[in-house]
Amino acid sequence: VSATPPSAPPASAWAPLRLAVFRSLWLAVLASNVGTWMQTVGAQWLLVEQPNAPTLVALVQTASMLPVLLLALPAGALADTLDRRRLLIGVQCFLAAVGVLLTALTAADRMPPALLLTLTFALGVGQALTLPAWQAVIPELVPREQLVSASALGSISVNLARSVGPAVAGVLVAQAGVAVVFAVNTASFAIFAGALLRWRPDRPDGPAMPERFTAALRAGGRYVRHSPVVRRILLRAALFVVPGSALWALLPLVASQRLGLGPGGYGVLLAALGVGAVAASQLLLVAGLVYGGTLLVLALVPVPALVTAALVPAGVAWMTVLSTVNAAMQLFLPGWVRARGLSVYQMVFAGGQALGALAWGALGELAGLVAALAVAGAAMAVAALTVPLWPLRDTRGVDRDPAVYWPEPHLMLDAHPRTGPVLVTVSYTVPPERQDAFVEAMRAVGRSRRRTGAMRWGLFRAGERAHGFVEVYQVPSWEEHLRQHGGRLTGADRAAEERARALTEGDVHVAHLLPADEP
């Protein structure tokens, strides 16, 4: 199967599904997501009758999401440096092995809570490795104009699974037992692995000269740290997910303790969330208020029909926020750091859920279920009201395409790729009347340098030269600087540099300084 479509289909919400490779993998991911939600329902339902149930049930979500918090950035670095297809296939095999063990021990009635949480954590490790690699693959499968639709379809896959998986799991738990639910989840990993084996990319996933793992890890962290747009996206995700995690963490207890429902009824509640999520819009503030209102309904209304009805708009709100911030990240991140940037987003998302679930479970144990849900609902409403204060930034006019425009450096000596650190100086001449504007314009250039590899950056006046300015920045190695030359820069970086250089006069002089103690 070819990974590159011959032509871009008409732009529509469903256009990516007309591409055979995307459709095949999307259906496989849907099957895997259905299995994952069945697994969650089964694991939580095994614990609802245990002592300390509020904490144990909430810990299922923590065990699932904590690996993403711990491993997201390393997983993103792996996805940016290794063959993504092979990485995904290997991870699915690992997940299937864990699933077989989980199924066998549950069927043998040898599944104490500690072991269940340990194996749930192991499944979370696999998901942590899968998420950034899969998210980074999506832009390779569809034309750029279909990326928003493809991202939305990815979210729809999750929420279709959230609608179907819990309902099926509820029936299976009641009729066949939890072990059968775990077996179905294990089979879903095999389905995804099979689809990946059938996919044959036109070109290798990894770069021609892969980055070293530690260098890639540091480069990803620098990019996120020095990108205001990415930091704002992460802030909005965190402000929603932390209070929002209360619903997912405490819903099993609402079902069993307040509504008197069995596993089938709990599945229906989760299905109502999923149905609403499939039909979401793009209104962040309204979404937050709606979700907060649903948490208050769960706290105050012990009527199953009303709670089920309230969960549908909550699903809409959840999907609204997730699809909005996820698409914003995918559209903004350049290809060279996409998996690492998305992994940080997943880290914030998973960390918010894992730590939030732990906090809401502890509060539920100390103050009661109603108090925990009411506090979470109020916190969500406050977070929603911050949208006008810290909105997502409009990046529709920002050119994110790669731009190779720096001239190749010509050195009088041979520099080893790992030689470093390397100091780069750029000398400018700026007329007095333009100097204030030049200094301001160079702030954007400095952010660009840091995003693409510079550890330090500064702009200085040349004391011995009238109207002279010297830009100085340090990169970890010669290899890292060559990567700046060879594909890390985007059209937006080029535009920022051109705005600054338009304020200068005469030639610009560039020098590369290498360590004196290295040959």
Regions found by a protein language model. Name each.
Residues 344, 441, 484-487:
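Residue-level signal for well-ordered alpha-helical positions
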Residues 363, 422-428, 458-487:
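Short, well-ordered beta-strand segments in beta-rich or mixed alpha/beta enzyme
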Residues 184, 460, 511-513:
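Solvent-exposed beta-strand sheet faces enriched in polar/charged residues
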Residues 395-396, 447-456, 474-510:
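An amphipathic, aromatic/His-enriched active-site/gating alpha helix that lines ligand/cofactor pockets
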Residues 1-15, 390-424, 429, 436-440, ...:
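Intrinsic disorder in cytosolic terminal tails and internal cytosolic loops
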Residues 433-438, 480-483:
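Short, conserved charged micro-motifs
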Residues 1-394:
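Alpha-helical transmembrane-bundle signature of multi-pass membrane transport and export proteins
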